[in-house]
Amino acid sequence: MTNSGEKKFQPLHAPKGIPDYVPPQSSEFLAVRTAFLDAAHNAGYEHIELPVFEDTSLFARGVGESTDVVSKEMYTFADRGGRSVTLRPEGTAGVMRAVIQHNLDRGQLPAKLAYHGPFFRYERPQAGRFRQLQQVGVEAIGVDDPALDAEVIALADRCFRSIGLDGFRLELTSLGDSTDRPAYRAKLQEFLATLPLDEETQRRAELNPLRVLDDKRPQMQEMLADAPLMKDHLSDSSREHFETVTGLLEDMGVEYTINPRMVRGLDYYTKTCFEFVHDGLGAQSGIGGGGRYDGLMAQLGGQDLSGIGFGLGVDRALLALEAEGKTASTGRRVDVFGIPMGDAAKRHMAALINELRAAGVAADMAYGNRGLKGAMKAANRAHAQLAVVIGDQELEAGTVAVKDLQLGEQHDVAVADLVTHIRRQLA
C-alpha cells in the first residue's frame, strides 16, 4: 500500500517466453511473414484460417502421444463445458481436420493450403525458443508424387532467400513408410535394449523408438553413435522416391545435405523429411522444416490420402537475419506526411490526408501543435518521401507546399491538384 492508502500494482509484463513485437521490429516481423506468404501464394497455395485451439484428441491422435509435444509441451485445459481443449502446438493436424470437415479432399487435388499464426508449446524459454512461436506453413494434400515433395522443399528454400537470408543449409532424409518401419523398429529396439537407458527413455523406446534418436543430450548422442540407420532399411519404392526427390532438387538448383540421423519431433512423418538450419542461432538452429505424412488423414478419420508440408519460424528467421547482420526490408511506412502550421491549417490538412488515403496513398500527419522543425523530424522518422506543409500563407493562396524529402526540392501546388500531383511524384 502507498502512503495515500492506494494499492501499489506491480508492472505488467508479457507472460514468460512470449515475445512482444513492437515498432520498428514489428515492421520486420510483418515483412518476413508477408514475404513467406507471398511466395506460397505465388506457388498456387490458397489461404486457410484455423482456430488457435482444438479438441485435445486431435493432437494426441495426429501428432503422437509418445512425442514431447503431446506428453510435455501442450497447453491443455478444460473449458466450461468440461471438454479438453489445447492451444495448437503445430499446424498440420488442424489443417487436416479442416480438410476432412469441409470435404476439401474431394475437390481438385492436390489441395494446396497456406496458413500463418501463433502456435504454443510449454518449453523452457531461451534464445530462439519461445512458448508462443509464430509460423508460416503450407500443406499439399492428396497426391503421392515425389515432384510435390521437391516443390514444397524448393518453396521453403525460396521463402528464406526472399528475405535475404543465405547462411542456412537444408538437411534431408527418408523415414521410410509403413512397410519399412516394422523391421527397422525391431532392429532399433534390439540395439536400445543394450544401452543403460533411464526410465523415461526406456518408455520412449517401447512406445516409439525413433523418439529416442531425437534425444539431444550429449551423453545420449554418444551412446546412439552406432545405432542402426533407417537408410539401410528402406524398401526399393521408398529409396526410389527419395532419389527422385533429390534429383529434382538438383535440377532446381536447391542445395542440400543428407542427414541419415534426422528425426523430427512429430510422429506422423513418412518418407521425405527435411529441416533448414542456421548455425548463427546456436543450439536452437532449426529455422523451419517439414516432411511427408502419408497415413495421417486416415488416422484422423478421413480418406487414405498422402500429404506433405512445412512450417517456417518467423521468430527464428528474424534471429537468423540478425545473426547475419541483416534486417528484413520493410519498405516506406508512409508516402506523404502532412505538416499543418496552426489550428486552421490542421482542419484543412486532416481533410487532405483523408482524401489522399481514399486515393490509395499512404499518408500520415503531425499532431500536437509541434513546430516545423519537430514535424520535419517526425516526417523523416516515418520514412516519408514527401512532406505537405500548410501555413497561413498557403491557406490564403489555396495552395500547399510539397517538399521532396529525398531531393530537397519544394513546389507550391493548388489544393485541387494535390492528389494528381502526389500520384505523379510517387510514380
Curated annotation (Swiss-Prot):
Q: Would the keyword ATP-binding turn up in this protein's UniProt record? A: yes
Cell compartments where the protein resides = Cytoplasm
Single GO MF descriptor: histidine-tRNA ligase activity
Query: Which PROSITE patterns would you find in this protein's record?
Result: AA_TRNA_LIGASE_II
What general EC class does the enzyme of this chain belong to?
Answer: ligase
Query: Which Pfam families does the record associate with it?
Result: HGTP_anticodon, tRNA-synt_His
What EC number(s) does this enzyme carry? 6.1.1.21
- Assembly and partners? Homodimer.
Q: What is this protein called?
A: Histidine--tRNA ligase
Q: What is the lineage of its organism?
A: Bacteria, Bacillati, Actinomycetota, Actinomycetes, Mycobacteriales
Which gene name belongs to this protein? hisS
